[in-house]
Amino acid sequence: MFQDNPLLAQLKQQLHSQTPRVEGVVKGTDKGFGFLEADGQKSYFIPPPHMKKVMHGDRITATLHTEKDREIVEPETLIEPFLTRFVGRIHKKDDRLSITPDHPLLKDAIPCRAARDVTHTFQEGDWAVAEMRRHPLKGDRGFHAELTQYITTGDDPLVPWWVTLSRHNLERAAPDVEATERHDGELVREDLTALSFVTIDSASTEDMDDALYVQDNGDGSLQLTIAIADPTAYVDAGSELDKIARQRAFTNYLPGFNIPMLPRSLSDDICSLRPDERRPVLACRVTIAADGALGDDIHFFAAWIESKAKLAYDNVSDWLEEQGEWQPQNDAIAEQIRLLHRVCLARSEWRTTHALVFKDRPDYRFLLGEKGDVLDIVVEHRRIANRIVEEAMIAANVCAAIVLRDKLGFGIYNVHNGFDPVSIDQAVTVLDTHGVQADAQTLLTLEGFCKLRRELDAQPTQFLDSRIRRFQSFAEVSITPGPHFGLGLEAYATWTSPIRKYGDMVNHRLLKAVITGQAAEKPQDDVTVQLAERRRLNRMAERDVGDWLYARYLSDKAGTDVRFNAEIIDVTRGGLRVRLLDNGAVAFIPSSFIHAVRDELVCSQEMGTLAVKGDVVYRQGDTLDVVIAEVRLETRSVVAKPAA
């Protein structure tokens, strides 16, 4: 009798519309219950039965109820699922498959089946790519996923690499395309094969893309010629290989190996500036004044060169520091090293005064066994030979930025606008609190930004510097010229790594148009979007593989009294994030390991401090000795505690 009662329907509608609702993101716990973190910072309890309808990270709307004087929410509609495409491990029971997502807060296995075009027979422990197909809040009975790609077996030693590349949908191998013949068109090449060009790289490098030559002008100034490998002589714009390079955007450097942007036949052989091999290059010649300033005689041209020596960073550094056994093979090479050293010192001094110089941070290199096991982690400090190459490349990129700006008005530029205007007042307040006077409008200028950076670099600790970095904007890729505040330069356009960066290939083509006087086509905006997105994915992949390898490396140190010196890189609500300075690993120190009484302890992300009973015990940038408390291999996380 009530079935079609309009009054009842109206009452239901009224109750539905009067029920309060909240929108937010589901936060799971390992206890079965969860929370809905609403956009207004408020958190609502989700009881275990309701958590079965949602997944950690889902954005939902939920109805709000009161139960036993406590506000709880019941999930109602799905706005955006947390999981769409994901990687995970297969479970097999009675020929039924399920997959556990590879995520620290997703512990439940999701029923699944293989897509029709996937021929692999999945076994327990296999890794796979899956896509969500059903969700309870979409009216389905439960969660269900479809396996779209087999990655590898559970016991494959290379799991960290293959799983990470699949997670970020990145290529696993070099492009399988043959390079074409060289096409120079109207480009005329100067013959510089008699000059003593040298390359300086890591000893293991095969894709050498820059060679240097210096001439002493006899009046205190030097003439620097930067010769860069010329892959665009072999890769025509719009060709199949060009489309592949554009899609990849960069060579992907992961611990242990790289996945090149171009076929290895090009990157490691045909284009690589190998010693005693005649190679086509794009070159730039410029005068370096005695004070390090770049002359106004910047000249770009095409050439043939023949590198006379493949030098290694450590050997060159040892020789300049008068240590070790290594000697240059002849006087001409020795003279080039001396002149390059002069270029480096002059340019470094000029940049320190007129621009900005990054503080040297060490690189960490994994030494891996044949089965992907970590034998050791080597700290590689930046030495004088690294700085020689860096100064030459920065000079070359400034030259390209000037020429492209003045001749064309466009190119692929690296742009960094310093402080985010939205955050500038907060930055001024923080500076003022620490006794540094600053004006918001001045800080938004290149000159004002550089002045502040020099002041911060002169501080006795990195604390204020690390607090201020939070208010800076991110570097971007732009077709329009603009300043790079981080480098303290008015414009910066890279062209020195065309074997491994697609943006540099684009700039090569534009520079060639300037050289030949032909019309240049302005790059499309979607190129910059692709470059930025691929750079983000490659960095995440490098970090993910690194986390996996660090967890493997440190697992046998857990629970021992092996001490590591660590730097505090962040203060969070729950404790401290630290970097182990001996190997570069990032670990977390829960606040409970620092002080047992929670109410007496305050972790302030805003202030970058951890205080106990009102006294600051640790600040961001401080160093302390730690021991490894626990390594969670399944989530690749390292938990540390202060050493006793």
Swiss-Prot record:
A single Gene Ontology CC term: cytosol
Residues in S1 motif domain copies: 561-643
InterPro entries: CSD, NA-bd_OB-fold, RNase_B_OB_dom, RNase_II, RNase_II/R, RNase_II/R_CS, RNase_II/RNase_R, RNR_Ribonuclease
Keywords of the record: Cytoplasm, Exonuclease, Hydrolase, Nuclease, RNA-binding
Pfam families reported for this sequence: OB_RNB (PF08206), RNB (PF00773), S1 (PF00575)
GO BP annotations listed: mRNA catabolic process
EC number(s) per entry: 3.1.13.1
Cell location: Cytoplasm
GO molecular function: exoribonuclease II activity; RNA binding
Class of the enzyme per the UniProt entry, highest EC level: hydrolase
Domain of life from the UniProt record: Bacteria
Catalysed reactions listed for this entry: Exonucleolytic cleavage in the 3'- to 5'-direction to yield nucleoside 5'-phosphates
Record domain RNB: where: 189-516
Function: Involved in mRNA degradation. Hydrolyzes single-stranded polyribonucleotides processively in the 3' to 5' direction.
Family of the protein in this entry: Belongs to the RNR ribonuclease family. RNase II subfamily.
Cited NCBIfam families: 3_prime_RNase (TIGR00358), PRK05054.1 (NF003455), RNase_B (TIGR02062)
Full protein name: Exoribonuclease 2
